[in-house]
Design a protein with these regions (language model features):
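Catalytic or ion-translocation cores adjacent to nucleophile or general acid/base/metal-coordination motifs
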Residues: 108, 112-116, 120-124, 128-130, ...
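C-terminal catalytic or substrate-handling cores of phosphate/nucleotide-
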Residues: 190-224
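Glycine-rich beta-alpha junction loops
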Residues: 87-91, 137-139
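Short, basic, glycine/proline-bearing loop/turn elements
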Residues: 53-57, 97-109
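Single conserved hydrophobic/aromatic residue that forms the stacking wall/gate
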Residues: 1-5, 9
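Generic secondary-structure signature for well-ordered alpha-helical cores
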Residues: 63, 69-81, 122-130, 167-176, ...
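Extended, well-ordered protein cores
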Residues: 17, 22-56, 63-70, 76-78, ...
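General structural feature for long, well-ordered alpha-helical segments within catalytic domains
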Residues: 21, 36-39, 63-71, 81, ...
Length: 224
């Protein structure tokens, strides 16, 4: 009987957190948000059967932060039980893998493995409940470094602080790196992030050389 009651509460908690996430996601902002909103809307109807039936939901740094804060507030108010948040390695900053996750970095640094390690260490320093750093993952041993985390939402104000400090860090590590590699969309995202956190946090941005000017200088130099 107790197991059945637990299953009811677990299912109710899933439904409540589904609705809470939907309230935070703006489906009209961009197609990806609309897709994520529809996915979480239909998650209960699709009757997931793997493991705990936990949801995989992709959001940007601030979307993840806001959803985590909402969940933690729901735990604090007794609306749901404690929640474990985590993420997989198909993410911006958690994995160095030149054959997959970092294959779109074209400045030559895609073969270095410092990003996942920095992400791992930063998550530890910011108070994540669980952190992991390991070799391999999808592309094979020696071809990737993966880092992950788990964060228990217990309803405490301390966890609110950890969310505010660690969730944006975990995501923006990878956006920052692609920004430094001159990825146009990452540069736009970092510029928006810096504007949002002006006075409290900032990510350095690359100085983009003028291709026409460089070509002109080389032509003039080689013509002499």
């Amino acid at each position: 009987a107790s197991r059945g009651l637990g299953d009811v509460y677990k299912r109710q908690d899933l439904v409540k957190t589904d609705h809470a996430a939907m309230d935070i996601i703006d489906p009209n902002r961009r197609f990806q948000d609309r897709d994520n909103w529809v996915w979480i809307r239909d998650a209960e109807k699709n009757k997931l059967v793997v493991g705990t039936q936990c949801r995989i939901l992709y959001q940007d740094a601030l979307g993840r932060r806001d959803i985590a804060l909402k969940f933690n507030d729901m735990v604090r108010k007794g609306e749901i039980g404690p929640v474990m948040l985590g993420r997989d390695h198909h993410d911006t900053g958690g994995t160095d893998s030149p054959y997959r996750e970092t294959s779109n970095i074209y400045d030559g640094s895609n073969f270095t493995a410092d990003m996942a390690t920095h992400c791992f260490a930063g998550n530890a320093a910011r108070g994540m409940s669980l952190i992991a750093l390991h070799n391999g993952g999808g592309t094979g041993i020696g071809k990737a470094i993966n880092g992950g985390f788990g964060l228990v939402l217990d309803g405490s104000e301390l966890t609110d602080q950890i969310i505010r400090e660690s969730i944006p860090w975990d995501t923006m590590v990878g956006v920052s790196r692609r920004n430094w590699a001159r990825n146009e969309h990452s540069i736009e995202t970092v510029a928006e992030y810096n504007k949002t956190f002006e006075g409290s946090d900032a990510i350095t941005m690359p100085y983009i050389a003028d291709d026409a000017l460089i070509e002109k200088v080389f032509k003039e130099a080689t013509a002499k």
